[in-house]
Amino acid sequence: MDKTQNSKSVNDMTVGSPLRAIIQFAIPLILGYILQQMYLIIDAAIVGRWIGVGALAAVGASSSIMFLIMGFCNGSCAGFAIPIAQAFGARDYAKMRTYVSNSIRIAVVFAVVITFLSCIFCGKILHLVNTPKEVFDDAYIFLMLQFAAIPFTIAYNLLSGQIRALGNSKQPFYFLITASVINIILDAILILGMGLGVEGAGIATWLSQGISVLLCIWFIQKKMQILIPKGEEKKFDNKKVSILLNNGVPMGLQFSITAIGLIMLQSANNALGTVYVAAFTASMRIKYLFTCVFENIGVAMATYCGQNLGARKLERIGQGVRAAIKMMVVYFVITFLLIYPFADEMMMLFVDKGEAEVVTYAAQFMRIANYFYPCLGLLTILRYSIQGLGYSNLSMLSGVMEMIARCGVSLWLVPALAWTGVCFGDPVAWVMADLFLIPAFLWLYKHLKKEVL
């Protein structure tokens, strides 16, 4: 038995109340994500109000591209953490560390290849999504700076994913606090003080991500040595690499496939003009702030299901899913009471009151999306639960459903309804994904229960 297994830095989610375990794990994730989105909101407010709506549009014009590439990186790293969580739940710590060492090898290769290809094709991608000419140069500069930070993004998501696989979501939250505060300070210095514009926003993000990586490394070395491979555990293991890729690549592709639909939707929206691009950017910032609770309840479910599958506690997995759905319903009611009456005021964070069109369109987007938040909540809970159970291919197929839905909206609804069609892009995608995920999860859960019995 590993002497470090009882460290206060780890959290066993296979015992105790499922609801309590999920809430305790999810709260730091939610707070961290809110903090991250608050930074993005402050960043967009600085760009939109002090540089101009055109600069805000430049940052927003590349958002779906960033989701395509960063989504693959983040999803892959999250997938690499699943076998680690399962091995931890099974108390097989040597196996867990072998997964850690081999996931690092894969991540290094991914970082080099993805960074190189992204930088090479940056300009062509912006043309592909119909980026408005008046904001193209700024969008190109901002995107290149984001691509330069890909190695840091992969490193942070890999290391924080390993920490969370052992049930510790607090430390990554503390690291995000530090990085976000530094990011905001750098924004103020580089954009307001030095007048660097969108370049300043990109540089600030680059530096803060590097700091978050260093903090993860420090914590693992000092407080979570159970993750550090020893001796034979450091060797390349073809079987372990195959398992890691089978979990990581489908999860990465799920995000990227979803992003293809978002790119199609954003491309259709970009063609409507700069006002609509700015409205889309502002509304997405607020949307992500509200939907992060759904997303991070889902992330908690991936670790929860992974650990409990390793411990062969299938009944406990079902209890956890039901508890998460109850949390989702309560949160939806809260969002409705905030968004429906105050959407317009929220949008004024990004643009002056004189930009009435931007405010009106962005508020419309928020209200329509809010009606369908229960669909999004169910989507994240079931998708991440399936991932935690080790069936990433099924969750990837739900991403395909989202992509098909958004492409359909882009090709037919947007030409017919213009901005209103854009507003229905997300809701239609969420409903389509749920139509696949609900029967998929029920089948998988029944199948696994038979295997355990």
Regions found by a protein language model. Name each.
Residues 24-43, 145, 156, 179, ...:
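Transmembrane helical elements of multi-pass membrane transporters/channels
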Residues 1-26, 84-149, 193-249, 305-372, ...:
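Short alpha-helical transmembrane segments in multi-pass integral membrane proteins
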Residues 56-116, 153-172, 279-343, 376-398:
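Small-residue-rich hydrophobic transmembrane alpha-helices
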Residues 77, 145-164, 172-180, 201-214, ...:
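Short runs within selected transmembrane alpha-helices of multi-pass transporters and secretion channels
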Residues 15, 19-38, 42, 65-72, ...:
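Residue-level signal for short hydrophobic patches within transmembrane helices
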Residues 68-71, 183-188, 213-217, 289-292, ...:
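Hydrophobic transmembrane alpha-helices of multi-pass small-molecule transporters
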Residues 38-56, 126-133, 189-196, 256-289, ...:
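Helix-terminus/linker motif at the lipid-water interface of multi-pass membrane proteins
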Residues 47-67, 133-138, 198-199, 240-247, ...:
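Interfacial/gating helices of multi-pass transporter permease domains
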